[in-house]
């Protein structure tokens, strides 16, 4: 039995949300031993090498280069710098919470610039996902979140989310004309080349401790490479707004990843309720999904999200 394309899109973003949830805890572990610039270089270099064959016979229209450069510089250079330095200046719980703001900006930008809309019932389910993510990440223990004590780091994480939301919007437009693998490869090249210059200029040591190397490779392969492919595939099949709406479920997986890396922690009742609300809302969001709306003829910002190709 063939799985419908839109269903594959929802499955792709659900899996991507799991990988996205692992990102903060895994990054926090790696940053304890490796300089942020070196982390940003290596986690983009590894998938860039793996995807390099996709550049064969690639042709990019001259009119697409400004948008492609914007997505590469903002998403693969500026965002990692701000994110990793912000991550060093805040707590793990704050990073899980604030990582979800990328989904918020992706939804807002899809609404404002891509002309995407959802049905009233989808908006209701979206609200349920947001509330569930809020419960999972905060546990309603606001004294532990320490926003004021880590204000600079928190603001940097939000700034990184704005950068990635901007890059996501540009990518959603470019995916209408450029296949997933080549687009991702060009963006990774932007990041790899930029950090290859920044690392020696900063004087950061390239040496990676052997006990951290597996975490770094896992971060590169899963949280960057696999996540980006699945994320872009969801863009093409269900649209940027619905992709961004489901991404906050990463908070649940982020908490579970934190328990794996820090086994002394336990789930609270509030987190169990929040996780159930997120999963239930996700099911409702899928069951009551509506068709992706398109703009009037002549308006080209909205990608043909529901009619993308079957393969990257």
Predicted regions and their residues:
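Hydrophobic/aromatic residues within transmembrane alpha-helices
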Residues: 30, 39, 86, 112-114, ...
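Helix-helix packing/entry segments at the starts of transmembrane helices
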Residues: 39-42, 80, 95-101, 170-192, ...
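Juxtamembrane helix-entry segments on the extracytoplasmic side of multipass membrane proteins
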Residues: 5-9, 33-37, 41, 60-66, ...
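Hydrophobic transmembrane alpha-helices of multi-pass small-molecule transport proteins
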Residues: 46, 51, 69, 109, ...
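Glycine-/small-residue-enriched transmembrane alpha-helix faces in small-molecule transporters
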Residues: 1-38, 43, 144-173, 256, ...
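Cytoplasmic-side transmembrane-helix entry/capping segments in multi-pass membrane proteins
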Residues: 13, 64-73, 118-130, 178-187, ...
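Transmembrane alpha-helices of multi-pass small-molecule transport proteins
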Residues: 32-78, 105, 163-167, 184-203, ...
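Specific transmembrane alpha-helical segments of multi-pass solute transporters/efflux pumps
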Residues: 19-26, 55-99, 133-135, 220-238
């Amino acid at each position: 039995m063939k799985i419908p394309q839109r269903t594959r899109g929802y499955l792709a973003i659900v899996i991507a949300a799991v990988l996205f949830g692992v990102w903060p805890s895994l990054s926090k572990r790696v940053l304890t031993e490796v300089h942020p610039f070196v982390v940003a270089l290596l986690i983009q270099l590894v998938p860039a090498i793996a995807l390099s064959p996709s550049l064969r016979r690639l042709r990019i229209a001259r009119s697409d280069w400004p948008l492609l450069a914007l997505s590469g510089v903002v998403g693969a250079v500026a965002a990692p710098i701000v994110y990793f330095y912000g991550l060093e200046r805040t707590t793990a719980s704050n990073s899980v919470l604030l990582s979800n703001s990328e989904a918020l900006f992706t939804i807002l930008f899809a609404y404002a610039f891509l002309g995407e809309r959802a049905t009233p019932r989808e908006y209701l389910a979206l609200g349920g996902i947001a509330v569930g993510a809020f419960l999972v990440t905060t546990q309603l223990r606001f004294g532990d979140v320490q926003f004021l004590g880590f204000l600079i780091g928190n603001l940097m994480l939000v700034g990184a989310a704005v950068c990635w939301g901007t890059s996501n919007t540009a990518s959603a437009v470019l995916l209408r004309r450029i296949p997933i693998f080549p687009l991702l490869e060009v963006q990774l090249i932007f990041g790899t080349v930029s950090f290859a210059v920044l690392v020696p200029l900063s004087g950061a040591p390239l040496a990676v401790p052997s006990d951290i190397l597996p975490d770094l490779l896992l971060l590169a392969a899963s949280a960057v490479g696999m996540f980006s492919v699945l994320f872009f595939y969801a863009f093409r099949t269900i649209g940027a707004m619905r992709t961004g709406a489901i991404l906050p479920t990463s908070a649940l997986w982020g908490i579970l990843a934190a328990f794996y890396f820090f086994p002394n922690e336990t789930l609270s009742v509030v987190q169990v309720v929040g996780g159930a609300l997120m999963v239930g809302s996700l099911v409702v969001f899928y069951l009551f999904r509506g068709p992706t709306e398109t703009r009037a003829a002549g308006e080209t910002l909205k990608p043909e999200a529901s009619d993308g190709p079957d393969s990257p």
